Amino acid sequence: LSTIGIFSKFEMCGGSEIRCLELANAIDRYTDHTPLLLCEKGMPDKLLSYKNDEVKVVENIFLPEPINLKQLYGVDSLIIINTDCKDFSTLDYWEGRSARHTVNIDISKISQMVFLYNFIVSPSRHLHTISKKGIDVRILTTNTRFFEEIGKQDRYEMVRHLPRMILNSPINTKEVCLIKNASNKIRIGRHSIGSESKFDVENLNLIKEINKRYENDIEWDFMGVPRRDKKELKKIKNVTIRDTFSIPVPKYLQDIDIFLFFVSLKREEPWSRSVAEAMASGCPILATDKGGNKDQVINGNNGFLCKNKKSFYEAIVSLMEHKERIKEMGENSILYSKFFTSEYIVNKLVTFIDLKS
C-alpha cells in the first residue's frame, strides 16, 4: 500500500481546508492507499469534525518547531494544497529560506510532489526550481482558467512541460437529498460564508426588483450574508436570513429550488463548493460569468451565467415564466455533479499520480 500525504497550512476553516479533509476521507474510503494529513503548524478543532476517524493528522511539520518533519519523508506522494500561499511552490520554502520558517529539509527524500492550485495559480511558475532537484513534480489546477493560463502565458514557460490536470474539489454527495420539500412558492437562495465578496451589493436591488413582479410567488432564503446587508434584507417580508451553517447544508438545500450565486462582480471564484453542493441537490444555478463558475454552469442548460444584475433578473424571470425549466435544469445539475463526487475525483487523482497499490 502507498501513503499519500496532503500538506497545507490549515490556518482557517474555509473551502480550501475542507477540500483537504474531504480528499483525505475519499482516499481512505475509495482506494487502497493510506492518506496522511500533514500540517505546516496545527489544525483547528473545527476542521477535525470533517475528518473520518481513520484518517491520521500530523501537526508541527515546520512550525512552531519541526517536531514531525520526518513524516514528510515517509509518503510515496506528497500533495501540496496551495490555498493562498505563494511560498509552497518555491524551493526556498522547502529549504528554509522563506519568511514562513527556517527549516531546511532534504527534499531529495521526497520522490513525488503534486501541487494543487486551489485559489491562485501564479506561484506554479516557480516549480522548475524544485523539479531540477530530481523530484517528480506534477500540477493540478482547480479550474480550466488556471489550467489554460499555464499553457498561454510566457511566465510559465519553465514549467509548461510538467504533467498537469484539472481536478475539481471532491464533494461528498452521500447525504444530499434529491427530493425537495414541497412548497407552493419558488424558493431562491444560497449558502456561503458571510463575506462581502461572496454577496454582491446589488443582490438587495435584485430582490426588490424581482419582488415587484413576483413577491407573492417567491421566497428568498440566504444562509450566510454580510453584516452590511442584514438590516435591509430583514425589512423584506419574504426574505429569510440564517447564520452561516446554522443548519446542515443538505437540509438547507431541500428547501431551495434555484441557487443564486451572485458574488461580487469583481470576484474570480476559483471553483465553488456551495455551487457544487447545490448542483448535487438538483438546483439550477444562477452564477456570475467568471472564474470556475464557467466550469460548473453550462449556460442555458443547468443554469445561467450572468454578467450583471440585469442578466440575473432576466434569468430569474425566465425560470419564473417557464417553471418546468427549473426541474429540467435541476436534473442536468444532478447529472453533472457526478463528475465531482468524492469517489470520482479521488480515482482521477490516483490515476494521475500513478502510484501502485
Q: For the regions a protein language model found, what residue spans apply to each?
A:
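A short, glycine/small-residue-rich beta-strand->loop->alpha-helix junction that serves as a flexible
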Residues: 8-21, 196-199
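A short, active-site helix/loop in glycosyltransferases that binds the activated sugar's phosphate group
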Residues: 120-161
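Conserved catalytic-core segment of nucleotide-activated headgroup transferases in glycan assembly
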Residues: 172-173, 181-235, 244
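A charged, aromatic-enriched C-terminal amphipathic alpha-helix characteristic of glycosyltransferases
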Residues: 307-310, 324-354
